[in-house]
Amino acid sequence: MAKIMLGSHSVKSHGWKVAREHLCDWLILVVLGLIDIVLNVIEPFHRYIGPDMLTDLTFPFYEDTIPMWAVPIICILVPICIFIVYYYYRRDVYDLHHAILGIGFSCLVTGVTTDSIKDAVGRPRPNFFYRCFPNGKPKFHPDTKDVVCHGVKKIIKEGYKSFPSGHTSWSFAGLTFLAWYLSGKIKVFDRRGHVAKLCLVFLPILISILIGISRVDDYWHHWTDVFAGAIIGIFVASFSYLHFFPYPYDENGWAPHAYFRMLAERSTGRATTMTRTGSRGMLGNDVEPGNSASSPHDRHRESTDSDF
């Protein structure tokens, strides 16, 4: 399929126009970020943990294989770098803007959803015992038999945030969006059967899976936490991508909806201008007496008659 190219739509020429049209969306993005910060500050629900429940919570307390600060780099900054590279190849600010806005919504909606569930559920992590009792000596309330933690407050707080996995949900939110994006750009569903295209699309998904596995290996999450996080990330990423872009197998799957809407509006504007110009020309010919010039309609009719 030949791509429709009507001049360059660069950041310099159309960037402010596109951003201004979506100013409300960017403000919502900021609000989502603030909400997620609040959700990370508030205290999660402290689920009851009795002596007989510690069996599955006494795994070693290891450091993260992939620290939390690295997750936004992997799932947001790396995809944005790919979006920018594609922008310099095609010079389409519509694609760049909607890709960045889309992955931002994907990750922040996922973050708010994940952290809301974390705070509400309050599931203890597999390494909760050593978060709660750093010296290895458990202590329980004499009446309720609930744990009485004597560890670092911040570490204990994080110990109640096992379900679902934030690393996993964020990774799938960003990298699934990237997989959708690559599918549309390289036309992975062009029915030519090139396996290399599938490998490229599956690579971000594989990275997300490995990040999720690392959370189980580090004893920071149960496998069900990782599974739930993956479902949330994939679900939100898919909806976010399809909100801004067509399906990758669509004929126009290589560009955002806004790009084709802009082309349609431009074509409509040109057609309206040509119609008005033609109408003024026809009126001028009718007013001038003795003008032998024929109208566009007459010329079209004469041209048609001459063909026969």
Swiss-Prot record:
| Stretches for region Disordered | 274-308
One protein family per Pfam = PAP2
Q: Which SMART domains match?
A: acidPPc
| Keywords, sorted A to Z | Hydrolase, Membrane, Transmembrane, Transmembrane helix
Show the GO MF annotations: hydrolase activity
- Recorded topology in the membrane: Multi-pass membrane protein
Q: Where in the cell is it found?
A: Membrane
UniProt biased composition (Basic and acidic residues): 296-308
Membrane-spanning parts: 26-46, 66-86, 93-113, 162-182, 193-213, 226-246
**E.C. number(s) listed in UniProt:** 3.1.3.-
Which residues are in coiled coils?
A: none
Q: Which superkingdom, per the lineage?
A: Eukaryota
Which GO BP terms sit in this record? phospholipid metabolic process
Q: Does the keyword Nucleus apply?
A: no
Describe the family membership recorded for this protein in Swiss-Prot or TrEMBL.
Answer: Belongs to the PA-phosphatase related phosphoesterase family.
Protein name as it appears in the record: Probable lipid phosphate phosphatase 4
- Gene it is expressed from: LPP4
